């Protein structure tokens, strides 16, 4: 039985990570503390905005469903 592709990828990931040197990032600068705090705050605000939009979109709209007069024997609490 052949292992799935992602399993092979996960097994080879440490090998690929060990091949890269620590200073291989050319042109990368350090992040200042205010910039890092701003990025974290912006991420938190965007996450809350996404959660709010999903909450508003998933709310039931309009009037509630009307109860019908049917008797459901196998459903407790109905009829």
UniProtKB/Swiss-Prot annotation:
Residues bearing the modification Phosphotyrosine: 72
Cited InterPro entries: HCST
Superkingdom as given in the UniProt entry: Eukaryota
GO cellular component: cell surface; membrane; plasma membrane
Disruption-associated phenotype: Mice exhibit low expression of KLRK1 in NK cells, but no expression in resting T-cells. KLRK1 expression is not induced upon T-cell activation, while it is up-regulated in activated NK cells; NK cells promote KLRK1-mediated tumor rejection due to substitution of HCST by DAP12/TYROBP. Mice lacking HCST exhibit antitumor phenotype; they show enhanced immunity against melanoma malignancies due to hyperactive functioning of a group of T-cells that share properties of both T-cells and NK cells (NKT cells).
Signal peptide per UniProt: 1-17
Extracellular topological segments: 18-35
Keyword line: Disulfide bond, Glycoprotein, Membrane, Phosphoprotein, Signal, Transmembrane, Transmembrane helix
Topological domains annotated Cytoplasmic: 57-79
Annotated TM spans: 36-56
Job of this protein: Transmembrane adapter protein which associates with KLRK1 to form an activation receptor KLRK1-HCST in lymphoid and myeloid cells; this receptor plays a major role in triggering cytotoxicity against target cells expressing cell surface ligands such as MHC class I chain-related MICA and MICB, and UL16-binding proteins (ULBPs); these ligands are up-regulated by stress conditions and pathological state such as viral infection and tumor transformation. Functions as a docking site for PI3-kinase PIK3R1 and GRB2.
Oligomeric and partner information: Homodimer; Disulfide-linked. Interacts with KLRK1 to form a stable complex, which results in surface expression of both proteins, whereas alone, it is minimally expressed. Interacts with PIK3R1 and GRB2. Interacts with CLEC5A. Forms an CLEC5A/TYROBP/HCST trimolecular complex depending almost solely on TYROBP. Heterohexamer composed of four subunits of HCST/DAP10 and two subunits of KLRK1.
Protein name per Swiss-Prot or TrEMBL: Hematopoietic cell signal transducer
Protein source organism: Mus musculus (Mouse)
């Amino acid at each position: 039985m052949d292992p799935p592709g992602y399993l092979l990828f996960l097994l080879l990931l440490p090998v690929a990570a060990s091949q890269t040197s620590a200073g291989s990032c050319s042109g990368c600068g350090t992040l200042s503390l205010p910039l890092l705090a701003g990025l974290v705050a912006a991420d938190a605000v965007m996450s809350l905005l996404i959660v709010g939009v999903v909450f508003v979109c998933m709310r039931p709209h309009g009037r509630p469903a009307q109860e019908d007069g049917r008797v459901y024997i196998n459903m407790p609490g109905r009829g």
